[in-house]
């Protein structure tokens, strides 16, 4: 039987090729006849899935989500050290793709919903009568300029505003984009116009993060409005790393970013629920309790934030306790977790009672659990964490077909793939997890 390490190497190569299909997908044209749209992607767009579905039954993910695209760019950065990355025989340089992404995002700053409203007499006539109910009202579009664009969740792959109703605002996008840019700037030789554009985007994203973190928004699952652990944690990290970058450029701005970051982390300390043994994922704007308090979003936040500190990082015992609680939840809830081989860990979802498509399991959730173990694998508990991480990966291996293709979910009862096909986030999560495993093995002195 193929060893786990050999399978990881083979699957990562496939994940890289498939993820690249979502970056600058210029060869795909997306038709949305109900909205009268024909979308020709622009260079630098990163679609959540390159499959042009239309809820038939798979969801339409042919949009550039700010969050998903930043996560994909972080995975691309991890591949960058290998130089050209294979896209089915045609080398595509990671740095060139990052440059396209930066250019695409810079252009978004000029979007203005007021211009869309002024032209609405023309484009609204192309919308089918039964799709009018899904359109954003003119009053909402009128407010869509400046910072509102940065919180607008997603845009079309051609760089135009999304005219359909959706869960807005979402304030994690600028923070995640800032983290992606900061990390590329530290690890790659950016020069000339690309560096200038990166710095301009970065300043805007840090300002947005500093000014908006106290405001309620929708969560990363786009379902509930409130103050969310994920959004707050990635915002705190963006401001902390941004302060380091600003320190020699604008000392006062650096101090401001660092103070806001520390204020956010102090707020997140209050999300710990000692009687339940986990970090809550949200405080709802309504003040009502949420059934989604225990959520993989907390683990995902720790991974995106990185390893710079202990609190609210993969090495935080409370983050690890939150993963333990999630294990117990999905052990009880998912049929595919019952009677599994001892070499496999539990398949994980998002939260209890998820009703989206099959309601999980999710590849990115189970991979996040593995990555958390690898990132936390230091000190006396290292070997146990490495072994635990491998058990999650064995579960992922069991539910990925021989083709290596990854959807968004695998059914909690049957293990069959469901929801969006070729989800870029699934592939990015695999790449990030594999990199964390290699780093952890290096710390151990193994291979």
Name each model feature, range by range:
Residues 2-37, 50, 114, 263-278, ...:
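Non-catalytic carbohydrate-binding regions of carbohydrate-active enzymes
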Residues 1-67, 100, 104, 108-157:
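Low-complexity, Ser/Thr/Pro/Gly-enriched N-terminal "stalk/linker" regions
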Residues 115-201, 211-212, 216-220:
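Active-site lining segments of carbohydrate-active enzymes
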Residues 70-91, 176-192, 234-251, 300-314, ...:
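Well-ordered alpha-helical scaffold segments within catalytic/enzyme domains
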Residues 4-15, 85-108, 127, 169, ...:
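Extended, well-ordered alpha-helical scaffold segments
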Residues 168-174, 181-185, 195-250, 254-257, ...:
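Aromatic-lined, polymer-binding surfaces characteristic
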Residues 106-162, 229-232, 236, 254-364:
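Extended ligand-binding clefts on enzyme/binding-domain cores
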């Amino acid at each position: 039987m193929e060893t786990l390490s050999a399978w990881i190497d083979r699957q990562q190569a496939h994940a890289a090729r498939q993820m690249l299909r979502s970056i600058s997908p210029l060869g795909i044209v997306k038709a949305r006849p109900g909205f009268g749209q024909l979308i020709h992607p622009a260079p630098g767009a990163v679609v959540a899935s390159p499959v042009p579905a239309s809820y038939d039954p798979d969801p339409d993910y042919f949009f550039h989500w700010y969050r998903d695209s930043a996560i994909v760019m972080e995975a691309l950065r991890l591949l960058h050290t290998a130089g050209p990355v294979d896209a089915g025989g045609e080398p595509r340089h990671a740095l060139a793709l990052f440059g396209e992404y930066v250019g695409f995002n810079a252009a978004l700053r000029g979007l203005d919903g007021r211009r869309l409203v002024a032209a609405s007499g023309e484009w609204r006539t192309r919308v089918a009568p039964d799709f009018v109910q899904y359109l954003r009202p003119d009053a909402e579009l009128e407010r869509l300029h400046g910072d509102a664009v940065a919180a607008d969740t997603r845009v079309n792959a051609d760089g135009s505003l999304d005219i359909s109703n959706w869960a807005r605002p979402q304030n994690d996008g600028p923070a995640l984009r800032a983290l992606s840019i900061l990390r590329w700037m530290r690890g790659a030789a950016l020069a000339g116009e690309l560096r200038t554009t990166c710095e301009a985007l970065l300043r805007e994203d840090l300002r947005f993060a500093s000014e908006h973190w106290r405001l309620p928004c929708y969560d990363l699952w786009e379902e509930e409005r409130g103050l969310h652990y994920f959004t707050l944690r990635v915002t705190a990290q963006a401001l902390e790393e941004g302060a380091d970058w600003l320190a020699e450029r604008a000392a006062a701005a650096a101090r401001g970013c660092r103070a806001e970051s520390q204020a956010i982390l102090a707020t997140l300390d209050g999300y710990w629920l000692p009687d339940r043994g986990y970090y809550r994922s949200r405080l709802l704007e309504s003040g009502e309790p949420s059934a989604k308090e225990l959520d993989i979003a907390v683990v995902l936040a720790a991974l995106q934030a990185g390893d710079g500190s202990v609190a609210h990082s993969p090495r935080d015992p409370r983050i690890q306790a939150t993963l333990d609680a999630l294990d117990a939840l999905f052990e009880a809830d998912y049929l595919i977790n019952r009677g599994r081989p001892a070499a496999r860990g539990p398949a994980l979802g998002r939260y209890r009672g998820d009703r989206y498509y099959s309601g999980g399991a999710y590849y990115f959730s189970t991979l996040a659990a593995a990555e958390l173990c690898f990132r936390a694998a230091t000190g006396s508990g290292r070997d146990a964490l490495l072994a635990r991480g491998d058990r999650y990966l064995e579960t992922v291996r069991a539910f990925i077909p021989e083709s290596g293709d990854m959807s968004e979910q695998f059914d909690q009862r049957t293990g069959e793939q469901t929801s969006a096909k070729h989800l870029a986030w699934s592939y990015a999560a695999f790449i990030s997890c594999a990199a964390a495993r290699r780093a952890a093995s290096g710390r151990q002195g193994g291979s």
